[in-house]
Amino acid sequence: VACGSRPIILKPKEGLVYDNERVVYSKTVEAQNYLDAFKNIQLICKENGIDLIFVFPPNFQVFNSSFYDRFNKLVNRENKIFVYDTLNTVYKDKNYFYDGSHLTKGGAEIFTSELSVFINATK
């Protein structure tokens, strides 16, 4: 059994349409045990000198800023959050997505470049 990830070199799925619908995130869907686990992971990393970077990758839909706002409130200030370039029109082009959640090789190269710049700037 192979593990890990690999680039998707297949052509995008047919009928892929960018989702412009804005979704409002609600805290009512949160489970306290997950919130506690999230806080605990951050604490363990801090105690062990591990720098955390939380990454928001692109999906083939409008960025959920209400979820980001909630997430940002849960992240300890010493940790960092990277959000893909939401203004880059590439992320609205179906040719850079295999499906709604997975980038093609070309899309992954663009996203990886953005992430690399962010990581190098935080050193």
Predicted regions and their residues:
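A short, structure-level motif marking secondary-structure boundaries and short turns
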Residues: Y25-K27, F56, G100
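C-terminal regions of proteins
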Residues: Y68-K123
